[in-house]
Amino acid sequence: VKKSIITSIILIVLLASGYYFWNKPTAKNETQTKDNPISDSTKNHENEVDTAFLKSVFELDDSYDYNSDSLLTQGEDNTAGVSQDAFAGQSRINIALIGLDGRMGATTGHADANHILSIMPDIGKIQIISIPRDTYVDCGYDDTTHLNKLTVYYMAAGRQSYLKKLAEIAKLQSIPYYIEFGFSQAMGVMSLFGYKSSETLQVLRSRKSFAIGDYQRVYNQAQFVKQLMVRHYNTLTGTFQPVFINGILALVRTNMKYSEISNIFSKLEQNKFTASPENISIKIRPSLKANYKVFDFSNPEMIAQMKQQLGLDRIAKRDTTAFTPTNFTKYLEKKLTKIIITAAKDTLKNPQLAINKLKPTYEQKIWLQFDNDSLRNLYSKKMSDLLQRAYLRRKDTLSANRVKAAYIAEQDLFIKSKVR
C-alpha cells in the first residue's frame, strides 16, 4: 500500500509539471503586473509601427541556423569579440549612434541599435563599438519581467544616463556626442546611398538565422557602417561635403555641429585615414570571442541575395500579429494628411496645439518612408510649412527658421546629391 501511495504521488507530480510547462503563461502576461506597468514593446509590436517594411521588423523564433558555407561571406573576424583593445589609451572622440524603435508619432522609443563611433583622429583610426540591445542593465525591474536590458534603459533612464551606461559597457571614459535616428531616417539615408531601404533593414535586423544571434546582428550592422564609409568617404569629404553633412544633420537628432564633423574629417585625412579600409575596426561589447561572419553589404544585389538565402520573406509571412496595409503608400498618405488637416485647423486659434500634433511626426521624418520622390518632397514641404507657420504664430522665429533651414538642407541632400 505504501509503495502504491508513493507511486501515486510521483504520478501526480509528473502530471502537474507537464500541465505547467504545456500551459505556461506567456512573457506578455508575466510582465503586465501592477508593479511593472511597462511592457516590453520591443517584442510585442503594436498595430501601427513606424516602418515602411512592416513585417520585416518582426523576428519570429525560427530554428534555421546557417553555417559559413550557406551564405556568401568575405571571411571571418576573430578579433572583434576579444576583450583586449589594441587602441587602449588613445585619445578619442566618441559618438553614440542610437537607432530608436518607436511607433509613428511617438516622442520616444527603445534603443534598438546601439553603436559608438570611437574616432582617433591623431592616428587616423575609427573603431566601431557595437553592443547587443538585450545586454543586461539594471533598469529597476524584477528580473522575471525580462525588462532589465539596454534597449529598455534608454526609455526608462533617459538619454544622459543611457550614454553613461553605454560608455561603461564599452569601457570608454565618456560619450559626449550622440546621433539618434528612427526607421524613417534610416530608410532615407539608405535610399540616398542607393540601397533598397526596406530590404537592407530587413537583413540588418535579422538575428534568428545566426548561431550567435544578436552578437552577429550588431556585428553585421557595424560592418555595414564600415563598408558604407569606405565606399562613400570621398563623397562625404569632397565638393558636396556641406550638402551631405548639413543634409544628414537635418534628418537626425544630434548635438553635433557641421564644424565639429568637418574638423574630424580633416584630421582623419591628415593622418592617412583613407590609406586602408583596415583603419576602421569593429569591437563587440560585452566581449564574446567568436568567429564573426563578414558579409558583403557594399552591393545592393548581394543584400537581395542574402535576404533570399536567409529566408526572411518566409519568416515575415509567418507573422500574424503585424498590421499590414494592402497599399502602404496610400496608408501613409492618409495618416499624414489627417495629421496635417487637424493641425492646420489649430494653427490660427491654438498654434501650440498644432505644434504638439506636428512635432513628433516631423522629428521622425515619416515622409522618408515613401519610395516615390515626389510624394516624399510633397509631404516634407507640407509638414515643414505648416510647422513654420505655427511657430510664427507664437512669435518663435528661431524655431521657425530652424525648420526652414532643415527643409532646405534636406532638399539639397536628396535633389543635388550625385549618389542617388
Q: What are these model-predicted stretches?
A:
Residues I6-Y20:
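Hydrophobic membrane-insertion alpha-helices, especially the h-region
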Residues V1-S4:
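Positively charged n-region of N-terminal signal peptides that target proteins for export
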Residues A16-R420:
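Non-catalytic, solvent-exposed segments at the cell envelope interface
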